Structure formats: structure tokens, C-alpha cells
Amino acid sequence: MKYAASLLLLIIITFSVYAQPKTDSFLENLIRSNASPFLKDVLNQPDTFQYQIIYTRINRDKRNKPHFKNFYFNVDRNRYFNPASTVKLPTALIALEKLNELNKPGVDKYTTMLTDSSFEKQTSILTDTSSGGGLPSIAQYIRKIFLVSDNDAYNRLYEFNGQQTTNEKLWRKGYKDTRITRRFVTMNEEQNRHTNAIRFMKDGRLLYEQPPAYSTVSFDFSKKIWIGHAHYNRDDSLINSPMDFTTHNNLPLEDLRQMLQSVLFPSSGPAKQQFNLTKDDYNFLYQYMSELPYESSHPKYDTTEFFDSYTKFFFFKAGKEKIPSHIRSFNKPGWSYGFLTDAAYIADFKNNVEFMISGVIYVNKDGVLNDDKYEYEETGYPFFKEVGTIIYNYELKRPRKYIPDLSNFKIIYH
């Protein structure tokens, strides 16, 4: 009886757990056998650090077609983690898909997009000083999303897509557990259902106008999610109770990994999971998923703040490490509320090595949310560095029947 009561309390107060986490002994043994004392200590506390790791092995056949095998370590899609900026990946993909399906003459990702204010708390955007021409566009927002994980850029794509369109498209692609309910700005649930009017312009001429939208989509919020033991609310007052994440964005690690694969290898998965993108869209995404801040001229970034590995958790951000010129990470990370997440495709053009690696960890020793006291530097980034290095070193030695041709991912950066 005591055990049952304890289990019920765990489900209600912390994370809902309905099944055993998925773990492949191969991956667990590989990581543990090469782990430092620091990493072993983290791995021995799965309930504290809530880590999940997916390693995707890629083998090419004689036609260079990729074949994928996933290995899991403590992966549980029912265990909630806050996805933070990782939701920007599907949001960007839906924006490009929606543009292609609109099929309006003269309207593409490079066309000037003006955002109007149509409901309470909404803001308008009529200029963008980060772009070469000083005007906002879908393309410029996507650049900023992948280069430095810009929040306002995400908000503008969220508004262009509309909450309902975003979620219904993702669900139709099979991502039933994914939900994107909110901008990254202080708004309530009702305000996030309203999205702004949008205008696409060229030389002062209106090409297409999208009216304000209201989302009537129904979300399943029956599973209550509480994290921590205290939190600061929007008024910066300390509340001595767990923080409620029931209505927050959700993106399971397995879904994030599959979305990344579907973009980098569009013919590799089920047809229904593919995004309706053009060849130019794919090339554009590959460039800005892998480009480093110093390589960008528009936007131009202060490289002291936005250093090479600013968005590259696997396996470089710890210590603000420089990334070797022969290695590129095509990825999307997220960080918020003590959760760090990254899903990456790593390509080593010198050694002809490629693999995917995805992971999440929770580093919040004091259990207080929104206090900006998280162990990102001490524990989080070193976790990604060491796990990534272990997998990379294994890949360097792993025999391959066919050497991959990675030319599709070799990009000339401006």
C-alpha cells in the first residue's frame, strides 16, 4: 500500500511515467565504459537528471543511400521535458511548407513580410535592421532561429503559421504527442490562440494579405505536469509549489530526432512525415542549421556573446570550444527551466564520418523554476560534450562497408 501511494505521488507531483524507459544495452555499455567519474555520477542518477539519449547510426549502401538504426538510453516519450527552442525547428518547417502551399505569385521566403497587431498583447513588425535590405522576411527569421535561436523570430513564424495550422499539420504527419501552444513572450492561453494579420509586400505593392486567425484546435491537457518544488511567477514572486507545465509546448525527443532526419534525409522516412519543401528550401536550411555566427553577415553578431559553439551542445559548447573546420553540426538546441536539449546530425568531412545524436538533461539542483540558477555550465554542457565525444570516437573507429559521400552537406559559407 505504501509503495502504491508513493508511486501515485510521484506521478502527480513530478513526471508522469507510464512505461519503462527504452534502453539498448549496446548504447548504455558504450557510454558507461568510456565515461569519466563526472559522467558516471550523472548516469547513476536518472531520476535527478532526467537524461535521455538517442544515437542514430547511419550506414550507406553502394548507391550512397542512408540506412538508419536508433539506439536508446533512458528514452521515455511520456516523461515530460520542456522543449524550449527545439519547437522552432518544426515551426520553421511548417512556415516553409505553408508558403509553398499558398503558391501566391511573387510570395516566397525572401519576400518582405510585415506583421500587424490584431489582438491584445500583439506587436507589429515593419522593419528588420538585421537584414540586408532592412525588411523582415520568412528567410531572415529562419536564419536567426538557427544561427542564435532568436525568440522573436520564432514568434513571427508562429504568427504566420497560426496555432491551429501548425498543430494540425504536425499531427497529420504522425507527431501526435507534439503540441505547440505558445509564443515565447508573456501571453495567456487565449491570447496565444490569436495570431496576427500578415502582409507580403514588394516595392510597396501588396502581394498577399493573411487575415488575423483564431485557433479552435482542441488540445488534450488531461495529463497534469508539475515540475520542481517551487517557482517564481510572472510577477517575480516566489511560489512554494511546483510549476505547472500542463499547457506548455511539448516535443518528445524521438519526434524531434525524426523531424531532423526528415529534413536532412527527406526520402528516408514515411511519406506522410515529409515536409513539402523545395530544393532551395533544403539547401537554405542546411546552410543555416550548420552556419556559425561569425560566418553570417546579415544578421551580423557580436562573436564574444555568440561564439562558434553557442548553439552546438553536441559536443562543443562546454568551455565555448572552437569547432574544427572539417566538422559541421546540423542541429536545433533548446534551453529553458533547467532543461537542455539538442538534436544534431554531425558530419566530419575529413574522416568521412556521419551520425545523429539527440539528448536532453535536466540540471536544477535547487528545484526552483524561473530563478535563473541552473547548472548549465557545471553539468549540462559537459554532459553533452562527453556523450558526444564518446559517440564520435566510436564512429571514427567503426568499420563501414561503404564510405559515405557527404558532398550534399558541404556548403560554401559567406
List the predicted regions and their residue ranges.
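Bacterial Sec-dependent N-terminal signal peptides
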Residues: 1-25
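Active-site-adjacent helix/loop patches that line small-molecule binding or acyl-intermediate pockets
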Residues: 22-36, 45-48, 117-118, 122-125, ...
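A short, well-structured edge-of-sheet supersecondary motif
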Residues: 33-75, 357-359
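Extracytoplasmic
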Residues: 46-50, 68-70, 76-78, 82-87, ...
